[in-house]
Amino acid sequence: MFEHETVLKMESIEGLNIKPDGVYVDCTLGGAGHSEEIAKRLTTGQLYAFDQDDVALAHAKERLAPYEGRVTFIKSNFVHLKEELAQRGVTKVDGVLFDLGVSSPQLDEAERGFSYNYDAPLDMRMDRSRDFSAYHVVNEWSFGELARIFFTYGEEKFSKQIARKIEQARADKPIETTFELVDLIKEAIPAPARRKGGHPAKRTFQAIRIAVNDELNVFDRAVQDAIDLLAVNGRICVITFHSLEDRICKQVFKERSQHPPLPPGLPVIPKEFEPELKLITRKPIVASEGELEDNRRSRSAKLRVAEKQK
């Protein structure tokens, strides 16, 4: 069963400022919680919903059946946002939503290899039509590359110890399953550190997932494209779940909400010198106490919202 608790649902819908006749894009369809809220607010408007996962798409089509005609499903990664919409004759939109949490069903489907809680082949591909998987990262990347991604993408302070342990183990035979990898991570991390801060494999698994799916580069490009696509007064809402994604979002929003250099002595700022984006949220919106109690995964969620000005 495809269960997925939607995070910051009403806050992000409010952030989009939906018009009944507007054009909206959900870049991360997942369990369709956000898409359902957008679709029910549309009359003559249209929602374009992206996901590269067949299971998520099948479930979402069922859930959004009451809104048939208002929703177009697109099986693609959001890095192809501009091209996919252009193929459908869409060049401007009124709102774009990103929810960067891996949907719980993908985490919980043992055979997908995302989770350190289930034994499964090392996989972690969001798009299963691609060949490159967690197996290739773990068994083929050099000690230096592994240590770098564990530290940079996972913020893992024992990155070198874990990379060294993997390098030693795979010299005997390939590392094939999630539990084999979990055991190596546990061996590499000193016992006192293993006992605090959640599951010892959490950061390493996050880093490998980001590397397999090239998540940070893909996200950076997609946010830039989404801002390009926005019509004047259109909104972009981004929900992130760790500091790396939030940093990218914050930086892109900051760059595109700054004034170009102004000629000295102007009494008023001419239209052409106004920044492209206006920040709706100076600080990110976080989950309420009630949501934190209902959904543990919301505790690291941050929502940022910006509006196109020109």
From Swiss-Prot:
Coiled-coil intervals, chain numbering: none
Top EC group: transferase
Compartment list: Cytoplasm
InterPro entries: RsmH, SAM-dep_MeTrfase_MraW_recog, SAM-dependent_MTases_sf
Enzyme Commission number, as recorded: 2.1.1.199
Region Disordered, annotated ranges: 290-310
Keywords carried by this UniProt record: Cytoplasm, Methyltransferase, rRNA processing, S-adenosyl-L-methionine, Transferase
One GO term of the biological process aspect: rRNA base methylation
Positions contributing to S-adenosyl-L-methionine binding: 32-34, 51, 78, 99, 106
GO CC aspect terms: cytoplasm
A molecular function GO annotation: rRNA (cytosine-N4-)-methyltransferase activity
Reaction catalysis annotation: cytidine(1402) in 16S rRNA + S-adenosyl-L-methionine = N(4)-methylcytidine(1402) in 16S rRNA + S-adenosyl-L-homocysteine + H(+)
Keyword Methyltransferase: yes
Xref: PANTHER family: 12S RRNA N4-METHYLCYTIDINE METHYLTRANSFERASE, S-ADENOSYL-METHYLTRANSFERASE MRAW
Function (record text): Specifically methylates the N4 position of cytidine in position 1402 (C1402) of 16S rRNA.
Family: Belongs to the methyltransferase superfamily. RsmH family.
Name of the protein: Ribosomal RNA small subunit methyltransferase H
Record gene name: rsmH
